[in-house]
Swiss-Prot record:
Gene3D superfamilies: NAD(P)-binding Rossmann-like Domain. Accessory subunit of the mitochondrial membrane respiratory chain NADH dehydrogenase (Complex I), that is believed not to be involved in catalysis. Complex I functions in the transfer of electrons from NADH to the respiratory chain. The immediate electron acceptor for the enzyme is believed to be ubiquinone. PANTHER family: NADH DEHYDROGENASE [UBIQUINONE] 1 ALPHA SUBCOMPLEX SUBUNIT 9, MITOCHONDRIAL, NADH-UBIQUINONE OXIDOREDUCTASE 39 KDA SUBUNIT-RELATED. Keywords: Acetylation, Electron transport, FAD, Flavoprotein, Mitochondrion, Respiratory chain, Transit peptide, Transport. The keyword Mitochondrion applies. It comes from Gorilla gorilla gorilla (Western lowland gorilla). Residues 1-35 form a transit peptide. The modification N6-succinyllysine is found at K175. Its cofactor is FAD. This is NADH dehydrogenase [ubiquinone] 1 alpha subcomplex subunit 9, mitochondrial.
Length: 377
């Protein structure tokens, strides 16, 4: 009798699962949808041990922004698939960011479509954070910002991915003097063509603990006087905090109205480059000695760093980007539209710049430093 009751329960459960699968399949239109999986059913009270219903593939997760995005996805109970090309020891810092079994690491080849298809086929969200500050003999800016995102977007669309998020740049412009920004603009277009519902994020220069923005300027103290084109009086910057960008990306994943939109992520204040670098040196308690260096001479210096066998501290393209004023894009939604209040630079700069202080000033209070002057241009 007990065996008969058990068999009836098994039959009911199997029928229920079949019915759920049939319903999930019947409501799918367009590209083929994968069968319902337990990881797609939200449950729990929130937190890393819950299930958010998000199965996200995050390309570029090992980079500066990627670790924050993975952490925010992991802490809400998402399953995160992390494609990587680096040594396994270089992804160890990501493992504690999710519950047991929720972070899956897969090796991939950026030029192999089968490899890309394998890492997106089980996801309902794909986030592309792939970027590079300088070109190499293996990957130039066109590869990184155009060809690879286009392939990922196309294969994600074919796999039935529900949400695709592509991170570009605020100053992406097909007519820009920077090859980096020109390819960013082309990348936006090809992604939009391949995945019309894609969400495009356009952040300004991002600052945070491991950035190449505040840290790059602060490290100039090693060279003595600080070279700035036109002393930085003709360039305006509006940097944004990395945690805000990460939260914005995650909120865009959860927002059903975000599909097909472009978002401009910027900080709350705009600064002349001169005042910004002066503030950076004040927080780092370093002597600020700026001098005007013509851009053609700056490019020549950058070329010397480019041909060195080490990671270039500056490149000719970075010189261009450094002296381009951040665009104002009031027609695009921003962080506020995703429920995020932008964090002022003055609140978080000390987290980044304390490491550049000498021992004498290591514990000095940030209140001793005057805030950077802001502009409205």
């Amino acid at each position: 009798m007990a065996a008969a009751a058990q068999s009836r329960v098994v039959r009911v459960l199997s029928m229920s699962r079949s019915a759920i699968t049939a319903i999930a399949t019947s409501v799918c239109h367009g590209p083929p949808c994968r069968q319902l999986h337990h990881a797609l059913i939200p449950h729990g009270k929130g937190g890393r041990s819950s299930v958010s219903g998000i199965v996200a593939t995050v390309f570029g997760a090992t980079g500066f922004l990627g670790r924050y995005v993975v952490n925010h996805l992991g802490r809400m109970g998402s399953q995160v698939i992390i494609p990587y090309r680096c040594d396994k020891y270089d992804i160890m810092h990501l493992r504690p960011m999710g519950d047991l079994g929720q972070l899956l690491f897969l090796e991939w080849d950026a030029r192999d479509k089968d490899s890309i298809r394998r890492v997106v086929q089980h996801s309902n969200v794909v986030i592309n954070l792939i970027g590079r500050d300088w070109e190499t003999k293996n990957f130039d800016f066109e590869d990184v910002f155009v060809k690879i995102p286009q392939a990922i977007a196309q294969l994600s669309k074919e796999a039935g991915v529900e949400k695709f998020i592509h991170v570009s740049h605020l100053n992406a412009n097909i007519k820009s003097s920077s090859r980096y920004l020109r390819n960013k603009a082309v990348g936006e277009k090809v992604v939009r063509d391949a995945f019309p519902e894609a969400i495009i994020i356009k952040p300004s220069d991002i600052f945070g603990r491991e950035d190449r923005f505040l840290n790059s300027f602060a490290s100039m103290h090693r060279f003595g006087p600080i070279p700035l084109g036109s002393l930085g009086w003709k360039t305006v910057k509006q940097p944004v905090y990395v945690v805000d960008v990460s939260k914005g990306i995650v909120n865009a994943v959860k927002d059903p109205d975000a599909n097909g939109k472009s978002f401009a992520f910027v900080g709350p204040s705009r600064y002349l480059l001169f005042h910004l670098v002066k503030y950076i040196f004040a927080v780092a308690h370093r002597l600020f000695l700026p001098f005007p260096l013509p851009l053609f001479a700056y490019r020549w210096v950058a070329r010397v760093f480019e041909i060195s066998p080490f990671e270039p501290w500056i490149t000719r393209d970075k010189v261009e980007r450094m002296h381009i004023t951040d665009m104002k894009l009031p027609h695009l939604p921003g962080l506020e539209d995703l429920g995020i209040q932008a964090t002022p630079l003055e609140l978080k700069a000390i987290e980044v710049l304390r490491r550049h202080r000498t021992y004498r000033w290591l514990s000095a209070e940030i209140e001793d430093v005057k805030p950077a002057k802001t502009v409205n241009i």
